[in-house]
């Protein structure tokens, strides 16, 4: 059984993230979506909220599990007995950072591979940052996120006002 981990902050989970999950879940026996607590980032949604959102969006995939994690990715990968780390590449600008991370992960986890997936054409430009900015400014994000995510955004923005 081949287990893969797809880590990210997923702040919020977008249609692009779901696209990668759908495709990766067809490749691997089990896919663990690791929702990261990153002390270097100031997420819009709390870790618990991001886990809840991801579970709502991805709950219909029988071989996908959503878990939160903090600390080193290598420890999360080991805990889940994963053989592959899945990463998305939207643009050439993502490549340099992801290439360096893959090299470091290979050093820390020599028996684990990193697999890059590019998004489907209609999702190449979507990012959580763009979605949040559009939503905060009152724009329509329905083409970029699922209805449940849009509701989470509206509720969070409403509380902030």
Swiss-Prot record:
Its catalytic activity?
Answer: (R)-4'-phosphopantetheine + ATP + H(+) = 3'-dephospho-CoA + diphosphate
Is the Zinc keyword given for this protein? Answer: no
Signal sequence, start to end: none
Q: Name one GO biological process term.
A: coenzyme A biosynthetic process
Which residues make up the binding site for ATP? 9-10, 17, 88-90, 98, 123-129
NCBIfam families found in the cross-reference section: coaD_prev_kdtB, cyt_tran_rel
Q: What does this protein do?
A: Reversibly transfers an adenylyl group from ATP to 4'-phosphopantetheine, yielding dephospho-CoA (dPCoA) and pyrophosphate.
Name of this chain's protein: Phosphopantetheine adenylyltransferase
